[in-house]
């Protein structure tokens, strides 16, 4: 039977760790760099006894009830065993002692230290000491001859010496090791060992083999090696019977040889490849306890029988099968269980010549095709090396029959056999876990700790219960539940408590929800899963619950217990988290190699419009790490933490990528310290976690205290002022992306928070620009200005001008113009997208009034109604062009005059995007925002309804079109009733409109309403220049069809003009505006009121009959009409 490896468990903090058995084999004793000696009853002992012997313990030895330790205060101490009572100090050194061993009867100890000395001390009388001098470097290891005649020692000076104890002389010295100046720099600690009982052989690990020397003659007998050994051997130890020798390497390989036959009996690989630094053979049975350089403790069982025979008469494990077993999902997933402590049997490599019939069966693939033997073995199984037959024929023995078919013969392993390819090795899959929980094997554990509360589980002899505690007791009071169904998974939200248990032979896996926020009397529900399907992960959201099962299914439920969607996962689930409408799933998307996990992530939104944000993208992890925590920030951004302490957050502003925002290991004082994350906040920026000294998770008692860590992005040169400001700027950007997400999805947030963040970011950019300007990095200044808002760019231009950086100021001015043009182009595109969207909604339903049909017309009607209500006590009907499409490109919000029906040019209300204004509060105003602002300024007593509707036209605040249903008001409803679209109008309606029109026109002879005239701005010099040169631009560029192209070309030509020419055009614009105003005033005085009324009646009738055919007037006409109306006010 091959050796069985049990999963390793945490023993001590990271560093050199040693292990030994007591005389009876009842206890395993370990010591480590944490200064503790732990006494384990077995590997499953969850509460080992410990003795603190000092700050660090470098070595320990146990014999006859005496525990001897070499500690960091340069002493060799004695404690009673197992009581752990101090029993004095045996000896002292000037530096640390590196190794201590007992002799055969336990009366003496030998210790070697870094001061080059070796001492033998009598345990009962510490004054009886012998000192051995001769090494020229620190002593690595020691070993007593079983007959107490010789003492062997290895040193950093590269030599292995054998001392005559009686006269303290060196009997022999071999230069076998690499030289070094300290133990920490030694490639191997070279733990050598004498053969028990007879002391016939001395085993020394040298490089990749074990050298054996004969006693007294000191001749080299032979080497023990294996083709699987790829790294230096660190330690050797003999079985109590003296027939087997075990060795451990610095890459985690443990090999056992039969010394007599030189056969390799067992090969076992450390599950994580850590260096083996402690090996101890059980005194009575075939068990080997081992420790690694990370402080972990492991155990091999059924290694070899102490009587000299293997524990199984036949070698049933074959190398081909072992290689296939590496990819066995069930066994390997248990082998790398980070959170569960169940024993896993992993067969080791055992040598043997394979029977032909059995070999054919084992070489069959899952698909039914035979595996090519050439991929596994170099030679046929029937071919045997001649040299092997000559040297091993005397060792060929036929084994006893044990009921199995065929006979298998053991032959010595020869170097001519080609080794199997050992890499890359697949990484054991991480088992499912619940974020905020501690391991299942603990009797008192946290089932979950999150921002809502804590769920503890107690499973001991007295009680099996679950306690629920809320951080805010106003949500719910603390609850105590009996755990009769053995619930192992839990989650907690402000609405419910969710529990799940695995299936048993009698009961199915269950999902239990305690819906304490329900308004009815039924506060809980339970759902049984189908047979052979277990719940592996659960989570709660707002109004829903989710459970991932072993059948690779994810089941969704309402919080009240209604089953909803069920869909398949692409791999076994690792963990889940929920927040609001978001569901965050991490699963295995493949097999990882060389210690890396291969995980995928899905992010779904389960609102009314269900959609998937992340479609199984790979989840980035630190090398050789695993997932430790997933969840959401308090603001709803997905985050996760790996076992190396790296916290990553979803960066929605960079294509949903993952950005590392904190390294918790930087805040740890010791190498074995960790932080256990319980929550993340973006505003304020806080990482809430629990410090764990010497562990990865906290105990339940005493109640752990939560610490707050700050975030820091891993930017370069963080010690410099430039690096600090860059890190602060991008951290501010990342941690305020959630505001855009909230606005996009219709959630409420404080506008002041966003304004404060923008202000903070612009201040950092200005500081970086000033720093770059001082360092003569003008190109870098322009790059920084590209990240600024329009106002900040204006400040940057002023700063550059005052700093006499004229070229920089010119570049920044060009950048400001480009940013304004880009902003205008973006707004035009958004308007076109909005029009296309609404056209699609109205496609095929041109005569059907919808909520999207004419929102701009609604706004106009409501504004006119408000104005008319303020001007007159009576409501008066107004004229609008029937059947006009508000969303066509030829018209917009300002193209139809509400009172007169006159048409104005569509760009009259738009701010010049190419004019840089330092006094403006916003970088640039879109047409809609400018229009809304002016309307709000005019409406002194504006209602909530009109305000809400005007806000919908602001593209900056509402990037996504969403219908707003206004509350009905009698006044506005009556005013709007005059403007409903009708396909057929009666003569009576026309007559009523004509009469009302006469009354309106007689009282108000204006051409345009006040709210539209206030949007008119004086012409600029560039506009007048563009009017006169438009024909030249079109003749030079006949392919120009878009007004934006004409304006851009005009800007380029206008910049070429000299300063004097530009001033001439500017003065011309001012003069024309003034003259137009004067002319309007004169016309108002001259025109006779009666004649004007008749003319207006005729024009109104024409407009009513020809409203659909009328085209917009040219630019100059609209300008004059607007100015005329403005002056009439």
UniProtKB/Swiss-Prot annotation:
Q: Where are this protein's WD repeats?
A: 11-50, 52-91, 92-131, 134-173, 184-223, 228-267, 271-310
Annotated crosslink Glycyl lysine isopeptide (Lys-Gly) (interchain with G-Cter in SUMO1) location: 1127
Single GO molecular function: DNA binding
Polar residues bias (residue ranges): 848-857, 883-897, 926-936, 945-956, 974-987
Where does the record place the region Disordered?
848-897, 916-1017, 1068-1113
Acidic residues bias (residue ranges): 862-876
The chain residues annotated with the modification Phosphothreonine are: 824, 826
N6-acetyllysine: residues bearing it: 671, 962
The record's Gene Ontology cellular component field reads:
cytoplasm; nuclear replication fork; nucleoplasm
Q: Tell me where in or outside the cell this protein is found.
A: Nucleus, Nucleoplasm
Q: Which residue numbers mark the cross-link Glycyl lysine isopeptide (Lys-Gly) (interchain with G-Cter in SUMO2) in this sequence? A: 397, 1127
Give the UniProt keywords, A-Z.
Acetylation, DNA-binding, Isopeptide bond, Nucleus, Phosphoprotein, Repeat, Ubl conjugation, WD repeat
Q: What segments bear the compositional bias annotation Basic and acidic residues?
A: 988-997
Give TM segment ranges.
none
The record's annotation in CDD domains points to: HMG-box_WDHD1, WD40
Does the keyword field hold Glycoprotein? Answer: no
Role: Core replisome component that acts as a replication initiation factor. Binds directly to the CMG complex and functions as a hub to recruit additional proteins to the replication fork.
Subunit structure as annotated in this protein's UniProt entry: Trimer. Interacts with the polymerase alpha catalytic subunit POLA1. Interacts with MCM10. Interacts with DNA2. Interacts with CDC45 and GINS2 subunit of GINS complex; these interactions associate WDHD1 with the CMG helicase complex.
Q: What is this protein called?
A: WD repeat and HMG-box DNA-binding protein 1
UniProt source species: Homo sapiens (Human)
Gene field: WDHD1
């Amino acid at each position: 039977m091959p050796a069985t490896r049990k999963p390793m468990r945490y023993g001590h903090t990271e560093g050199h760790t040693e292990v030994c058995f007591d005389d009876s084999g009842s206890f395993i004793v370990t010591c480590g760099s944490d200064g503790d000696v732990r006494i384990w009853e077995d590997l499953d002992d969850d509460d080992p006894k410990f003795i603190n012997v000092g700050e660090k313990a470098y070595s320990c030895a146990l014999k006859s009830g005496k525990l001897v330790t070499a500690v960091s205060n340069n002493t060799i101490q004695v404690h009673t065993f197992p009581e752990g009572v101090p029993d004095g100090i045996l000896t002292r050194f000037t530096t640390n002692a590196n190794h201590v061993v007992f002799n055969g009867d336990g009366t003496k100890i030998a210790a070697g230290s870094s001061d080059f000395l070796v001492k033998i001390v009598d345990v009962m009388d510490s004054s009886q000491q012998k000192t051995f001098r001769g090494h020229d470097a620190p002593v690595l290891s020691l070993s007593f001859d079983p007959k107490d005649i010789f003492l062997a020692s290895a040193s950093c000076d590269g030599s292995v010496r054998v001392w005559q104890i009686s006269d303290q002389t060196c009997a022999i010295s071999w230069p076998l090791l690499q030289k070094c100046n300290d133990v920490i720099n030694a490639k191997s600690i070279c733990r050598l060992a004498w053969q028990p009982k007879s002391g016939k052989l001395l085993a020394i690990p040298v490089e990749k083999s074990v050298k054996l020397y004969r006693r007294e003659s000191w001749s080299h007998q032979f080497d023990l090696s294996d083709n699987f050994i790829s790294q230096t051997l660190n330690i050797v130890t003999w079985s109590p019977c003296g027939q087997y020798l075990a060795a451990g390497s610095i890459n985690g390989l443990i090999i056992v040889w039969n010394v007599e036959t030189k056969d390799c009996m067992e090969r076992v690989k450390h599950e994580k490849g850590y260096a083996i630094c402690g090996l101890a053979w059980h005194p009575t049975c075939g068990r080997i306890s081992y420790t690694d350089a990370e402080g972990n403790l492991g155990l091999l069982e059924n290694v070899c029988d102490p009587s000299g025979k293997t524990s199984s008469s036949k070698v049933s494990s074959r190398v081909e099968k072992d290689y296939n077993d590496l990819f066995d999902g069930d066994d390997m997933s248990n082998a790398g269980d980070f959170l569960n402590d169940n024993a896993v049997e992993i067969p080791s490599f055992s040598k043997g010549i394979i029977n032909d019939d059995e070999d054919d069966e084992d070489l069959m693939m899952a698909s039914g095709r035979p595996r090519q033997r050439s991929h596994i073995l170099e030679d046929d199984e029937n071919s045997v090396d001649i040299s092997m037959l000559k040297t091993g024929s005397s060792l060929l023995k036929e084994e006893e029959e044990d009921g199995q078919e065929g006979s298998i013969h053991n032959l010595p392993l020869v170097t001519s056999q080609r080794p199997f390819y050992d890499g890359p090795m697949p990484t054991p899959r991480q088992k499912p876990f619940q974020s905020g929980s501690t391991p299942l094997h603990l009797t008192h554990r946290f089932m979950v700790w999150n921002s809502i509360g804590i769920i503890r589980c107690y499973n001991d002899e007295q009680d099996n219960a679950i306690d629920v505690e809320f951080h805010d007791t106003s949500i719910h009071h603390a609850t105590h539940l009996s755990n009769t169904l053995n619930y192992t998974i839990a989650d907690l939200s402000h609405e419910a408590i969710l529990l799940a248990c695995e299936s048993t032979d009698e009961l199915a896996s269950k999902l239990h929800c305690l819906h304490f926020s329900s308004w009815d009397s039924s506060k809980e529900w339970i759902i049984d899963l189908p047979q052979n399907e277990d719940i592996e992960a659960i989570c709660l959201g707002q109004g829903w619950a989710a459970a991932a099962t072993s059948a690779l299914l994810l089941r969704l439920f309402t919080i009240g217990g209604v089953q909803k969607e069920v869909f398949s996962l692409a791999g076994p689930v690792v963990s889940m988290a929920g927040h609001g409408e978001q569901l965050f799933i991490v699963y295995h998307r493949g097999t990882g190699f060389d210690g890396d996990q291969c995980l995928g992530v899905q992010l779904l939104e389960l609102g009314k419009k269900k959609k998937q944000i992340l479609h199984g993208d790979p989840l980035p992890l630190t090398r050789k790490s695993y997932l430790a925590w997933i969840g959401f920030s308090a603001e709803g951004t997905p985050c996760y933490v790996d076992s190396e302490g790296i916290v990553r957050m979803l960066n929605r502003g960079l294509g949903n990528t993952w950005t590392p925002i904190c390294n918790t290991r930087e805040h740890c004082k010791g190498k074995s310290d960790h932080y256990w994350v319980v929550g993340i906040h973006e505003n304020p920026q806080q990482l809430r976690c629990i410090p764990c000294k010497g562990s990865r998770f906290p105990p339940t008692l005493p109640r752990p205290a939560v610490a707050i860590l700050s975030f820091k992005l891993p930017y370069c040169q963080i010690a410099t002022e430039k690096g600090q400001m860059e890190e602060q700027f991008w951290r501010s950007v990342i941690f305020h992306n959630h505001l855009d997400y909230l606005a996009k999805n219709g959630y409420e947030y404080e506008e002041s928070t966003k304004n404060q963040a923008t202000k903070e970011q612009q201040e950092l950019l200005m500081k970086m620009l000033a720093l770059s300007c001082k360092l003569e990095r003008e190109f870098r200044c322009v790059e920084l200005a590209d990240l600024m808002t329009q106002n900040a760019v204006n400040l940057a231009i002023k700063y550059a001008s005052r700093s006499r950086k004229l070229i920089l100021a010119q570049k920044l001015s060009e950048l400001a113009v480009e940013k304004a043009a880009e902003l205008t182009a973006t707004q035009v595109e958004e308007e076109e997208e909005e029009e296309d969207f609404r056209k699609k909604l109205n496609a095929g339903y041109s005569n059907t009034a919808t909520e999207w049909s004419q929102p701009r017309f609604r706004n106009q009607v409501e504004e006119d109604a408000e104005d008319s209500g303020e001007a007159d006590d009576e409501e008066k009907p107004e004229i609008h062009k029937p059947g006009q499409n508000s969303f066509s490109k030829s018209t917009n919000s300002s193209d139809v005059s509400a009172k007169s029906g006159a048409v104005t040019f569509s760009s009259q209300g738009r701010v010049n995007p190419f004019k840089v204004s330092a006094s403006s509060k916003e970088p640039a105003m879109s047409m809609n925002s400018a229009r809304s602002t002016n309307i709000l300024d005019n409406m002194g007593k504006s209602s909530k309804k009109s305000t809400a509707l005007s806000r919908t036209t602001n593209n900056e605040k509402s990037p996504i079109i969403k219908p707003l249903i206004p509350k009905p008001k009698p006044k506005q409803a009556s005013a709007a009733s005059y403007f409903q679209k009708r396909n057929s109008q009666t003569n009576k309606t026309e007559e009523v409109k004509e009469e009302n029109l006469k009354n309106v026109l007689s009282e108000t002879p204006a051409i345009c309403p006040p709210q539209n005239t206030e949007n008119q701005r004086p012409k600029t010099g560039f506009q007048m220049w563009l009017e006169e040169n438009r024909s030249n631009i079109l003749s030079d560029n006949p392919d120009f069809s878009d007004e934006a192209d004409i304006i851009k070309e005009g800007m380029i030509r206008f910049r070429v003009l000299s300063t004097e020419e530009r001033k001439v055009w500017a003065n011309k614009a001012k003069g024309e505006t003034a003259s137009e105003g004067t002319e309007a005033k004169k016309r108002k005085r001259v025109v006779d009121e009666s004649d004007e009324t008749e003319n207006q009646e005729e024009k109104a009738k024409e407009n009513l009959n020809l409203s659909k055919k009328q085209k917009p007037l040219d630019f100059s006409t609209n300008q004059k009409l607007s100015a005329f109306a403005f002056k009439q006010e």
